[in-house]
Design a protein with these regions (language model features):
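Structural transition elements
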Residues: 247, 257-291, 310
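Ligand/substrate-recognition segments at binding pockets and active sites
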Residues: 3-7, 289-348
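Extracytoplasmic/peripheral linker and loop segments enriched in polar/acidic and small residues
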Residues: 328-333, 356-421
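Aromatic- and charge-enriched surface segment that lines or borders ligand/interaction sites
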Residues: 67-106, 187
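N-terminal lobe/hinge region of extracytoplasmic solute-binding protein
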Residues: 26-72, 80
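Ligand-site clamp/hinge motif
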Residues: 163-206
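Periplasmic-binding protein-like
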Residues: 232-268, 402-407
Length: 422
C-alpha cells in the first residue's frame, strides 16, 4: 500500500519535478545591485513588451497598443490598447496598470483600453519614448517570452530571479546577482552559475584552458566607449585642441570595433560618411602649436575615468603627453560634476534623437557643455519632423557636425565576452 502511495505522489508531482529538474536550465550571473523597481534591461525584455517598437527602418510599429492618434494640436497622444492580452498573473491587461514616469508628461487613463499622454509642448516623435517594456509591480509582464516564477530579495536587493518560459521547449532561466565581478567569477568557478558576460578580455582569456568552458565574443553596439571633452574648459574651448586629442588617440582594436560617431551602425539613421581621425601625432602636434604657446596652456588637463577603463585611460594619457599635453589621470568611483576629459561607457538611445545630450539648453545632461547653433538646429528639426527619410537626412548631418566639432571622441564599441559551460 505504501509503495502505491509513493507512486501516486510521484505521478502527481511529476509536472513540477519536470519543471525544476528535467528541463534545460540556464543560470546567468550578473554583477551589480538591482531592485524590483529597476531590474536589468535583459530581464525586462524577456518578461514583458512595450506599447510600440521602432523597426530597422525607423518606422513605429504597434505591440501592446493597436493604434494611436494626436489631439489638442499635437500635445496629447491617445493610445488604444489591445483588449485580448493578460498579465503574467493571469489578470486582464488594462490601461490602469500602465505606469510611466516621463518628464513634463501627464498620464491619464480614459477607460480600460485607452490612455492619454498629455505634453506641455507638441512633440511629433513622442511615441519613441514608449518603447520600454510595460511592467506591473512586482515584475509582472505581458505578451512576453518568459514570466517571473519567483524571486529572492535581501534587504530589498534582488539576489535571484527565476523565469519560466511561456512557450514549450524553451529553457528555464535563472538570474543570480553578485555585488562585484570578483564574486561573479568565483560563482562561476564554484558551479553556481552556467554563464556570465564581461567586457574584460584578460578575464575572458583566463578561461581559455578550461575544458568545460566555451568563450563567445560579440560586439556590443549598444555601448560606445567615449572620451567626453568639456568644451568650456580652458584651451579645450579651441576646436583645434579637441581635434588634436582625436588625432593623438590610438586605435583599440583589441578591445572593440572602432566607432564612427554618436550613433551605432545598428541605427537606421547611421552613416559612416563622417570625418575620420586616424592616429597622426604630427598632425596633432601642428594643431597644438599655437594653443600651447599661450600662458593658459600651462595647466594640466584632468582626465577622469573609472576602474574598468583604467588601461585605456593610461594609453590615452601616454599618447597625449607624447604630443606635448600635460595630463593628470584620476580613477573615480563616482560621476564627477566637473572635468576636462571623461572616459566612460555611453549607451545612446535607440532612436537617433540625442537632444538631451548635445543641445545647448540641456545643462544637466549635456555634460560636454557644447553650444553649437548648427547642432541645436539639427536636433530641434529632428524632433519636429516625423517623416523617416527627412529625419534620416537630418541625423546624418548631425553626425557629421558632431564629429567635426569633437565635443567627444567616440573610441569603440566594446567586445563582450560570454563565458559559459559547454
Amino acid at each position: 500500500m505504501s509503495g502505491f502511495f509513493i507512486i501516486l505522489v510521484l505521478i502527481n508531482l511529476f509536472p513540477l519535478l519536470n519543471t525544476f529538474f528535467l528541463k534545460q536550465k540556464e543560470i546567468v550571473g550578473i554583477a551589480g545591485k538591482y531592485t524590483l523597481l529597476n531590474p536589468p534591461e535583459d530581464v525586462l525584455r524577456l518578461i514583458s513588451s512595450p506599447l510600440i517598437t521602432v523597426d530597422q527602418n525607423g518606422e513605429i510599429q504597434p505591440v501592446l497598443a493597436h493604434s494611436w492618434e494626436t489631439l489638442n494640436s499635437g500635445k496629447t497622444y491617445r493610445f488604444h490598447l489591445k483588449n485580448d492580452l493578460y498579465w503574467s498573473d493571469k489578470k486582464k491587461f488594462t490601461a490602469k496598470e500602465i505606469k510611466y514616469t516621463l518628464k513634463d508628461v501627464d498620464v491619464k487613463v480614459i477607460d480600460d483600453y485607452t490612455i492619454d499622454f498629455n505634453l506641455k509642448q507638441a512633440l511629433v516623435i513622442f511615441p519613441i519614448y514608449l518603447t520600454q517594456p510595460v511592467i506591473k509591480y512586482p515584475l509582472e509582464g505581458v505578451g512576453s517570452l518568459y514570466s517571473v516564477q519567483s524571486y529572492r530579495l535581501e534587504k530589498n536587493i534582488l539576489k535571484t530571479i527565476y523565469l519560466s518560459p511561456n512557450k514549450p521547449g524553451a529553457a528555464l532561466k535563472v538570474y543570480k546577482f553578485y555585488n562585484t565581478e570578483e564574486d561573479l567569477i568565483n560563482a562561476y568557478k564554484k558551479g553556481e552559475i552556467t554563464s556570465f558576460n564581461t567586457l574584460n578580455r584578460t578575464l575572458a582569456e583566463s578561461f581559455v584552458k578550461w575544458k568545460n568552458t566555451k568563450i563567445d565574443r560579440n560586439v556590443d553596439y549598444s555601448q560606445i566607449i567615449t572620451l567626453f571633452i568639456n568644451t568650456r574648459s580652458g584651451m579645450l574651448e579651441d576646436r583645434d585642441v579637441r581635434k588634436a586629442l582625436a588625432y593623438a588617440s590610438p586605435q583599440f582594436n583589441n578591445f572593440g570595433v572602432p566607432a564612427k560617431g554618436p550613433l551605432p551602425p545598428t541605427s537606421w539613421a547611421y552613416t559612416d560618411d563622417v570625418k575620420t581621425y586616424t592616429l597622426n601625432e604630427e598632425r596633432a602636434i601642428n594643431l597644438l602649436e599655437k594653443p600651447l604657446s599661450s600662458a593658459s596652456a600651462s595647466a594640466k588637463l584632468k582626465l577622469y575615468t573609472f576602474f574598468d577603463y583604467a588601461d585605456i585611460a593610461e594609453q590615452l594619457k601616454r599618447n597625449y603627453e607624447n604630443v606635448g599635453l600635460k595630463i593628470s589621470l584620476k580613477i573615480l568611483s563616482y560621476i564627477p560634476t566637473d572635468f576636462d576629459l571623461l572616459l566612460t561607457s555611453w549607451t545612446p538611445p535607440s532612436d537617433p534623437d540625442q537632444y538631451f545630450f548635445w543641445h545647448s539648453t540641456q545643462q544637466g545632461t549635456n555634460i560636454t557643455r557644447l553650444n553649437n547653433v548648427k547642432v541645436d538646429k539639427l536636433l530641434e528639426d529632428g524632433r519636429r519632423i516625423i517623416n523617416v527619410k527627412q529625419r534620416e537626412k537630418i541625423y546624418k548631418d548631425f553626425q557629421k557636425t558632431i564629429v567635426e566639432e569633437v565635443p567627444a571622441y567616440f573610441l569603440y564599441h566594446p567586445f563582450v565576452y560570454t563565458i559559459h559551460r559547454k
